[in-house]
Amino acid sequence: MSMLPSFGFTQEQVACVCEVLQQGGNLERLGRFLWSLPACDHLHKNESVLKAKAVVAFHRGNFRELYKILESHQFSPHNHPKLQQLWLKAHYVEAEKLRGRPLGAVGKYRVRRKFPLPRTIWDGEETSYCFKEKSRGVLREWYAHNPYPSPREKRELAEATGLTTTQVSNWFKNRRQRDRAAEAKERENTENNNSSSNKQNQLSPLEGGKPLMSSSEEEFSPPQSPDQNSVLLLQGNMGHARSSNYSLPGLTASQPSHGLQAHQHQLQDSLLGPLTSSLVDLGS
């Protein structure tokens, strides 16, 4: 390791300082450290130094400088996730300033389509909402095994997928919510189908759901008025008198037929008299 001229640090030491300051969130101090570096092309082309410059440029809102750094140098795959976040977040911020409102999911998708990741920080693999299919495959496989990973397991998944722990946590939370919603929808459809089946079974096959008519006409006959009841009673008594084999009061079996007819007229008068009086009273 050779010391940098008039600086006192080796290139590896400079890279280590950049990484430590980034991880500690000391971005202003990192910016001052980068400004103090000597004008050495070999040093300024170091990937850790370039990444540190990109982080400082984003922190200060110097997005043009950020884009220039990311597009001008080929970065190693292990640095792609961090630099991709810087690229996308910078374009999101610029779009929000132009529109004057925060971006939703559709707005962010349009920004990603308009400003695709440069190949210097992207290996060309298709991504879905900034997640590579390979990373999503790892998460899906783990979800099938355990939908509730522990904090330690989330950190391990983040390292394996190149995502942050927050991204991993959000992915699992969103996936659980989608599965619960799908289960609730399926349960609702099943209950609706069962309810429809039960109602169909209760319907009469002949009457389309209407109750079968009773064979007894009396249940559905209209109520008879007092007058109608009296007339029916009279007709029944008269018919009974004609067909009965018993002797009527005051008559013998040997009486002539005209005597029987006269007695029937008397019987009608005796029955119709009170009935007529009742009808007159009801009508008055």
Swiss-Prot record:
Top-level lineage group: Eukaryota
Residues covered by region (Disordered): 168-271
Ranges of the DNA-binding region feature: 124-183
One Gene Ontology term of the molecular function aspect: DNA-binding transcription factor activity, RNA polymerase II-specific
Subcellular location as annotated: Nucleus; Cytoplasm
Residue ranges, compositional bias (Polar residues): 242-271
Post-translational modification as stated in the protein's UniProt record: Phosphorylated during interphase; becomes hyperphosphorylated during mitosis. Hyperphosphorylation impairs binding to promoter elements.
Keyword Magnesium: no
UniProt keywords, alphabetically: Activator, Apoptosis, Cytoplasm, Developmental protein, DNA-binding, Homeobox, Nucleus, Phosphoprotein, Repressor, Transcription, Transcription regulation, Ubl conjugation
Residue spans of biased composition, Basic and acidic residues class: 179-190
Gene Ontology cellular component terms for the protein in this record: cytoplasm; nucleus; transcription regulator complex
Biological processes per GO annotation: apoptotic process; branching involved in ureteric bud morphogenesis; embryonic cranial skeleton morphogenesis; embryonic skeletal system morphogenesis; epithelial cell differentiation; generation of neurons; inner ear development; inner ear morphogenesis
Function recorded in the entry: Transcription factor that is involved in the regulation of cell proliferation, apoptosis and embryonic development. Plays an important role in the development of several organs, including kidney, muscle and inner ear. Depending on context, functions as a transcriptional repressor or activator. Lacks an activation domain, and requires interaction with EYA family members for transcription activation. Mediates nuclear translocation of EYA1 and EYA2. Binds the 5'-TCA[AG][AG]TTNC-3' motif present in the MEF3 element in the MYOG promoter and CIDEA enhancer.
Family as reported in the entry's similarity comment: Belongs to the SIX/Sine oculis homeobox family.
Description of how the protein assembles with itself and partners: Interacts with DACH1. Interacts with EYA1. Interacts with EYA2. Interacts with CDH1. Interacts with TBX18. Interacts with CEBPA. Interacts with CEBPB. Interacts with EBF2.
Protein name: Homeobox protein SIX1
Organism: Lagothrix lagotricha (Brown woolly monkey)
Organism classification: Eukaryota, Metazoa, Chordata, Craniata, Vertebrata
Gene that produces this protein: SIX1
